[in-house]
Amino acid sequence: MPIAKDYPELSKLIEDMYQTMYHSNGVGLAAPQVGLAIRLFVVDTEPFCENDDLSDAERDYLKSFKKAFINAKILKEEGEPWPFSEGCLSIPGISEDVLRKPTIVIEYQDEHFVTHTETFSGLVARVIQHEYDHIEGVLFTDHLSSFKKQLLKNKLNNISNGKVKVGYKMRFFETNKKRTR
């Protein structure tokens, strides 16, 4: 659901989401991950700046990239898809290579509801795509092959049944295994 300018305590929500993300050692967090069906996610790529394979310029950029995205819409994804191991606070203990295009153009509003259209590339684009997927109802595992999903089935079932230990609070929703008419 789009967020209106008068959304109650939006600044506090954004700050709380950053704190939750930091406490959980994440680089991004979307509102659906904290139980809110709104188009909001936050990103802070500083943890990636420790990667020795990056140039000094890339490290500096990652270290300083922190943004909230409100009512975001990816307008374009470009380039040859490249694999990178992704994990997710919603699916703890699982990391898999996900193919994503390296460059995106995204339109979003900042915390002051100023609209921006920007182009991002590399790891920043990947994190944005990952978090954007959450507000679209998509998880990184949805990008995996059927074979890979089958290999992960038991782990995913354990997570969805609450059989997982993490250093942060998780909510588990009961699922009906049978259809009702």
Where are these regions (language model features)?
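Positively charged
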Residues: 1-181
